[in-house]
């Protein structure tokens, strides 16, 4: 018996040693709101696997709750500036301005907003990198890897200053600029649509013209933020000239929050890993009151409605338009909404400050999902095979819904011009037309039929970078080429010069021969 206990203790010690043999230290530069919800899933899994995770954040986040007891460690810097006004301006812009504009106008407006708040973002960055006590502490900790959401600039600068290899996690940048210019992601414009344009991989001639023009617009004019401003700031912080693409381009792995159940087929680099839906999981039981309401729907089922964590209120007029449409369907509706109760609200609709969205979408009685097209919600719908009514508002949402429309799993309506009839028609279409449910289930089967789960793949590559101090063997040589070398402009120029030289020499030889021939004939005639 004693020997059995000794063997058990020895085995446990061995397991402990093996488990900690791969344990490392992870530093995180996150983005708030829905981005944080996605990244947090990765961090929790890293903790389960024994890693030490430290999150960098400021003192006034929206969803990053650093005060709540957690296995995560937080390094918090004080932000004297209240960002409430900026958030309100952004919500107003997204809800009331952007939906009524064309693609380029909305992108320009969005770009202008980010240029306006660059001072706040710079202040936040400075509060980290010029905090000598914090930077010394971070350097002495010797982190193995840094996980960065590049939507907020400065994470790559932190990694450079700390000399830590880093992994990026993102859905897309504005116009896909960062992935294409800094990550060297191939993007043939003939069949790869520029992100955030609402185009698909099946483009007409005029759409390909539009795609090419928008690519130029995004590349030379509209960018995620003021590149010149940040490159000047980065160069000053590093004490040497640099560019955003130089620092961002040093990413070892790019974790893209999509997968081929969502994306159109396209070429990609070996250090790009698609991990869409990593936050999705089987549905859990609903709260009793909510379950009773769902069961009361009978054979008609339920509709789940959410515009995400950012847009929980709409104007009273818009709320009444929505409520009026919902009141006319036989399904019960669970609507995440914090505003004033609409006067047209039907008895079949209940309002909630918060809903267990994943659990509702996984409920067998769910018939449709009304969504703004956020990536997290889209993937929960794909995971559970639920058809969608898309009401995109801004950013990548138009693109996300366009993908779902192209795959036959969604109907889109315009948020700005939407009427009760539009919403009612869209709901009836996705609920009564069985093709939408069939296509949603097809995407769900594709999503579930992966050799390795998205979350496990994401964690694997983070751990891979930790174990190998990077992933340089996956880095394309394109990073070391100038733009004219990358597009073979120098080769094309050389070949054109060769052709021009050959034509020139041929012409000269021909003219010389003609002159000789003419002289010979004249001499013969004289004789």
From Swiss-Prot:
Respond yes or no to whether keyword Signal is given for this record. Answer: yes
Question: Topology in the membrane?
Answer: Single-pass type I membrane protein
Give the signal sequence positions: 1-23
Molecular function (GO) terms for this protein are: glucuronosyltransferase activity
Stretches in topological domain Extracellular: 24-491
| Primary location | membrane
Could you name the Gene Ontology cellular component terms for this entry?
membrane
One Gene Ontology biological process:
xenobiotic metabolic process
Any stretches that span the bilayer, and where are they? 492-512
Note the Gene3D superfamilies from the entry.
Answer: Glycogen Phosphorylase B
Query: Where is the protein situated, by its record's location annotation?
Result: Membrane
Could you tell me the keywords of this UniProt record? Glycoprotein, Glycosyltransferase, Membrane, Signal, Transferase, Transmembrane, Transmembrane helix
Q: Does the keyword Protein biosynthesis apply?
A: no
Q: Which residues are glycosylated?
A: 313
Q: Which ranges does the record list as Cytoplasmic topological domains?
A: 513-527
Show the catalytic activity.
glucuronate acceptor + UDP-alpha-D-glucuronate = acceptor beta-D-glucuronoside + UDP + H(+)
Intrachain disulfide bonds: none
Pfam families in the record: UDPGT
Task: Name the EC number(s).
Answer: 2.4.1.17
Q: Which family does it belong to?
A: Belongs to the UDP-glycosyltransferase family.
Function (record text): UDP-glucuronosyltransferases catalyze phase II biotransformation reactions in which lipophilic substrates are conjugated with glucuronic acid to increase water solubility and enhance excretion. They are of major importance in the conjugation and subsequent elimination of potentially toxic xenobiotics and endogenous compounds.
UniProt-recorded name of the protein: UDP-glucuronosyltransferase 2A3
Q: Which organism is it from?
A: Homo sapiens (Human)
């Amino acid at each position: 018996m004693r020997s059995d206990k000794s063997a058990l203790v020895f085995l446990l010690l061995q397991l402990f040693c093996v488990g900690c043999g791969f344990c490392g230290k992870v530093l995180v530069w996150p983005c708030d709101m829905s981005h944080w919800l996605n990244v947090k899933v990765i961090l929790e899994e890293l903790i389960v696997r024994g890693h030490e995770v430290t999150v960098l954040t400021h003192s006034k986040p929206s969803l990053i709750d650093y005060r709540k007891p957690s296995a995560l460690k937080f390094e918090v810097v004080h932000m004297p500036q209240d960002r409430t006004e900026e958030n309100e301006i952004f919500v107003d812009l997204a809800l009331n301005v952007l939906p009524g504009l064309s693609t380029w106008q909305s992108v320009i407006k969005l770009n202008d907003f980010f240029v306006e708040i660059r001072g706040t973002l710079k202040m936040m960055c400075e509060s980290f990198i010029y905090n000598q006590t914090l930077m010394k502490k971070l350097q002495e900790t010797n982190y193995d890897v840094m996980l960065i959401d590049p939507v907020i600039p400065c994470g790559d600068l932190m990694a450079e200053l700390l000399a830590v290899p880093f992994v990026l996690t993102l859905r897309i940048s504005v116009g896909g600029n960062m992935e294409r210019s800094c990550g060297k992601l191939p993007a043939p414009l003939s069949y790869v649509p520029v992100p955030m344009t609402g185009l698909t991989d099946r483009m007409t001639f005029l759409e390909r013209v539009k795609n090419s023009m928008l690519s130029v617009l995004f590349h030379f004019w509209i960018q995620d933020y003021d590149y010149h401003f940040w490159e000047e700031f980065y160069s000053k912080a590093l004490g040497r000239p640099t560019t955003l693409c130089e620092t961002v381009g040093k990413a070892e792995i790019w974790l893209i929050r999509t997968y081929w159940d969502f994306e159109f087929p396209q070429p990609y680099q070996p250090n790009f890993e698609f991990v869409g839906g990593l936050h999705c999981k089987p549905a859990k039981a609903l709260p009793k009151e909510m379950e009773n309401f769902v069961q009361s729907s009978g054979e008609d089922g339920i509709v789940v409605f959410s515009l995400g964590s950012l847009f929980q209120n709409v104007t009273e007029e818009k709320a009444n338009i929505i409520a009026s449409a919902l009141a006319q369907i036989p399904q019960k509706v669970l609507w995440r909404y914090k505003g004033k109760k609409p006067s047209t609200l039907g008895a079949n609709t209940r309002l909630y400050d918060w809903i267990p969205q994943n659990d509702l979408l996984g409920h067998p009685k769910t018939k449709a999902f009304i969504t703004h097209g956020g990536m997290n919600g889209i993937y929960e719908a794909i995971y559970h095979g639920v058809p969608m009514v898309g009401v995109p508002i801004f950013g990548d949402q138009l693109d996300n819904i366009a993908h779902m429309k192209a795959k036959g799993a969604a109907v889109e309506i315009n948020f700005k011009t939407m009427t009760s009839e539009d919403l009612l028609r869209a709901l009836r279409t996705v609920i009564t037309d069985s093709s939408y449910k069939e296509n949603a289930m097809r995407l769900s089967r594709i999503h579930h039929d992966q050799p390795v789960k998205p979350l496990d793949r994401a964690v694997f590559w983070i751990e891979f970078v930790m174990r190998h101090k990077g992933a340089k063997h996956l880095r394309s040589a394109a990073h070391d080429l100038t733009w004219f070398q990358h597009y073979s402009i120098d080769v094309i120029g050389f070949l054109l010069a060769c052709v021009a030289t050959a034509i020139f020499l041929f012409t000269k030889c021909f003219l010389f021969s003609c002159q000789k021939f003419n002289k010979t004939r004249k001499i013969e005639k004289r004789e």
